[in-house]
Each structure stands twice: as C-alpha cells, then as structure tokens.
Amino acid sequence: MADKPKRPLSAYMLWLNSARESIKRENPDFKVTEVAKKGGELWRGLKDKSEWEAKAATAKQNYIRALQEYERNGGGGDDKGKKRKGAAPKKGAGKKSKKGAHSDDDGDSE
C-alpha cells in the first residue's frame, strides 16, 4: 500500500520555494533562518498573491483526491505500529512524590 499523501504546501511556501534561490543570490551571507525571515517580509509586501493562491488551491484539491483514494484503498484505518501524537505521557505524569517514599517506619519507634 502506498504511503499517506503529504499535506499540500501553502501559497506562501510555494512562493518561498520559487523565490529562495534569488533571495540567497542577493544575500549570499544569509543563514537559512534569515532567508525565511526575508522571504516573509517580501511575501507580506507582495501585492498580487493570486497566482500562488491558485497553485495552493490546486495542490489542496489534488491532496484531497489523493487522500480519498488512499482511504478507499484501506489506508489510514488501522494504527498498527504507529504512535499517535500526544500519546506519550507528559513529563512528570504518574510520578509519585518523593516525600516519605523511602521511609520504612510509620513514625512508631519500637
């Protein structure tokens, strides 16, 4: 059985993937985080995002179709061998207080 389809990229991520190289070329000393930050600034300033929003909508429709096909073929129904997010116990959950935990006597001195 095929793997579950990956979620589609947002309009911003589609745009950033296409603009990343030009941002790097203009700012060769930028780190990955700085490229993303600059990309965010440029995206906010972008007047016409319709091209990227249309591409994102198409990608979302393709994802929905692929996901339905995946589920029709029996994917996603059973979680055998897969851990769910949030299934791990929270840090400190189930721990008992150390106060008096190692004490063998009940306070009686005989």
Curated annotation (Swiss-Prot):
One of its GO terms (biological process) is regulation of transcription by RNA polymerase II. Coiled coil: none annotated. One of its GO terms (molecular function) is DNA binding. InterPro entries: HMG_box_dom, HMG_box_dom_sf, HMGB. The keyword Cell inner membrane does not apply. Residues 5-71 bind DNA. One of its GO terms (cellular component) is chromosome. PANTHER family: HIGH MOBILITY GROUP PROTEIN D-RELATED, HIGH MOBILITY GROUP PROTEIN DSP1. This is Mobility group protein 1B.
